[in-house]
Amino acid sequence: MVSAVLDSRFNVALWIFQRHPKYDVVDALRRCQHRCWEFVDPHPPRMQRQLSSTNLSFHITDGCHPYPAVQADGSVSGGLEWSGADDGDCKGSAWGSQVYARSAWYNNKYAIMYAWYFPKGKGRQHVHKLHSGHRHEWEFAVVWVDQPSADHSNLLGVSMSFGPSFHKEAPVQPEHVVGSSIKLDSYSTFWGAKQGLRVTTDIGTTQDLIQWEQLTDAARASLTETNFDIDEAVVPVEMPLKDDVFQLKLNSTYPF
């Protein structure tokens, strides 16, 4: 049974860019990995309770911590050039963190996709073949439940992105759940060719949640139109919640 009470960690607020005039748009685009402010709303809609009740415990074995990808005015993170340590300059943002969510019915099951943005990620490039990483990374997980209810839905399974493929667990094993949250781990393969998610017994942290529909029009447009695959990674980097990708991901990661 999936059941939880919404707490302040999952409050979602729209940050108004004009409240911080010293950060102009150019600066935000250039150094947003250290300047992007998360979305937080003190009055989340009813659906927020369902998304929060299945929000995921996020542990990091390897690589960057998740960051906000976009601000309310549409300014997008410029990411980090791949260099140095896997988590170099990306161990967490003082301006908050973020997990993005979008949900839909699929094959008579209710799918909730959660997506995390990272300023850089592991994985080969087509052009610089000796590089073991690239600018920008998106990882996602799909939680499958029987109905969109915070108090009366049953957890059926989880799918997790992993390079060009995915991991799955259906049903989810008890050791991979804490409270009503599935425990996930962000990691990469030994040679760094793939980065993705897996279930774990380790407890991680949670990020402030924002629904795709709650983003400003400018933020949604920027996430849709921005080319996050500027380094031409062998596994293309794309925002999984946007319209032309979301349904394809549900289809390709269906675990039943």
Swiss-Prot record:
Q: Which domain of life is it from?
A: Eukaryota
Q: Predominant location of this chain? A: secreted
Key words, A-Z = Secreted, Virulence
According to its UniProt record, where is this protein located?
A: Secreted
* Record motif Conserved undecapeptide motif, residues: 111-121
Q: Which GO terms describe its cellular component?
A: extracellular region
Tell me the protein family, please: Belongs to the Necrosis inducing protein (NPP1) family.
Q: Record's PANTHER family? A: DOMAIN PROTEIN, PUTATIVE (AFU_ORTHOLOGUE AFUA_5G00600)-RELATED
Q: What is this protein called?
A: Necrosis-inducing protein NPP1
- Function of the protein: Secreted effector that acts as a pathogen-associated molecular pattern (PAMP) recognized by the plant immune system.
Chain location of the short sequence motif Conserved heptapeptide motif per the record: 133-139
UniProt-listed InterPro entries = NPP1
- Please quote what the entry notes about the protein's domains: The structure of NLP effectors is remarkably conserved with a high level of conservation of a central region containing the conserved undecapeptide motif AIMYAWYFPKD and heptapeptide motif GHRHDWE.
Q: What factors induce this protein?
A: Addition of glucose or sawdust induces a small and progressive increase at 2, 4 and 6 days, and a significant increase of the expression level at 8 days. Expression decreases 12 to 24 hours after infection of Castanea sativa roots and increases again at 36 h, suggesting the existence of a complex mechanism of defense/attack interaction between the pathogen and the host.
